[in-house]
Amino acid sequence: RQYYENQNWTVDPSKSSTFYAKWKDLGNSDVLAAFKGYEITQETAKKYYIPGKLVYCDKDIKLTRKAPAVTNASGANVNYGLGQNIFGNSFTSAISIDKIVFPTNVESTVYIYNTGRFHDWTGGSTVTGEGQIAAGNYLSIPKNTAPAVWGNQIPSMQGFLLKFTAAETTFNGADATVSLKYANNGVTPNSKPQLAPGAVKTNALSSLQITLDSKTTRDELWLFSQEGTSNKFDNGWDGRKFFGTPTAFIYTDTPDGPMQVSSNSTIDG
């Protein structure tokens, strides 16, 4: 199925409360487009063969802010998902997050959704440093802290969410363009399968990583000490907390809302 920011379909037309559907099922006759946001689910393991042309150049992707109003909704749910756009990495290599060019009206943060269960991958053991989170949760990766949070990568075929800044999340505003770079280390080539991201050469960032780990969920919080940032939302340095399906979360509360990645001039106190 394919994601549409500009839709809020009614799931059951006979019930006014079943809205917010933003995914459309696709059939065998539908054509997939590079870098669009798709979701594939199967009850059992299955192989998919996707023929097409490889992309070897920069790619501009368009963000819309046209989610229609929902009858009987209130508050932020009136235009549910407004300005939140889902894409997929159609390169055969990982995208370097710090090479992405964001316009000023878009948050310089990549949000990656985790569909897998971390404990299934680690056997229940605690693993630090890789920024893993529980299934059903988004991981916020700000552009300027990406090397420390998630190895600075959007893996090939990985879905990711981009959104307008809070001030620019206005209905029916102009589209915005984000540029995904291919040349000059815009993507990270993989010569062989990797079990973990390779080392990234970058200036050291002063940070504190806090892990919440239990039998039912796992979550992460990153605090960065960076001169010139504040206790409010600093675009490119802070990542908002998206609350998913797990029952326990960890985040820092700021004047601009909860953050999963928070940068300030000091993290003392």
Feature annotation, model-predicted:
Residues 1:
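Internal, well-ordered alpha/beta segment that forms a basic, Gly-enriched binding/recognition surface
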Residues 4-269:
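Compositionally biased Ser/Thr/Gly- and acidic/asparagine-rich
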